[in-house]
Amino acid sequence: MTLTTFALIRHGQTDWNAERRLQGSTDIPLNDVGRGQARDAVAVVSAYEWDAIVSSPLSRAAETADLIAAGLGLPVVRRLPELSERSFGPAEGLQAGPELDALRIEGGFRGAESEDEAADRGLTALEALAGEFRGGRVLVVAHGTLLRVSLSRAVGRTLQSIDNAALNLAHHHAVDGWQLEFFNGGPVMETADA
């Protein structure tokens, strides 16, 4: 059974994360806490050997990937636009409150990418990487909502929000689908195939 192993890492913290603002596709950089989280992630992911590091092109994910790559002595081989965060449209930059509530519709926000669209895009990108690096180990740095909805679809159950720079370890098999071994840095007791 040939497994492709993925470390799926959400970028480190940004000022908008700290302020609890929706970021989406808005390109917000890491803050100092986020840079520290990225450097701290090296200790966790260095327990494995990686064949490739890939990230979203948004600066918060790209810088997280660059910091992890430097710590591992590996290059980032690609920035994939398909790994960009879900677009929240006019809700980006807003915090919880009446203005955000006015944009809510079933499944998200008016003028935003739907959860299903984001899951389709993210899972398609991950499965393409699984095909390209079949039997290998790929470290992917992306975004919380994109990873959550893609992983939820892959394993067939709803997952909670993904922590900044935490290890999410998943395995892909072309026939048996996806298995989640670690989520938010902790072991998963039950795995489910897609």
PLM features: residue spans?
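Generic beta-sheet signal
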Residues: 6, 136-144
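Active-site-proximal alpha-helix that buttresses catalytic centers in soluble enzyme cores
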Residues: 4-72, 111, 116
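Short active-site segment of divalent metal-dependent hydrolases/proteases
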Residues: 14, 146-147
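Glycine-rich phosphate-binding loop signature in dinucleotide/nucleotide-binding domains
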Residues: 47-49, 129-136
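Short beta-strand scaffold positions
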Residues: 55-56, 120, 141-142
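Active-site signature of alpha/beta-hydrolase-fold catalytic machinery across serine-
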Residues: 67, 149, 153
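Acidic, low-complexity terminal tails and accessory targeting/binding regions
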Residues: 1-3, 74, 79, 86-97, ...
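Short glycine/proline- and acidic residue-enriched helix-loop micro-motifs
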Residues: 99-117
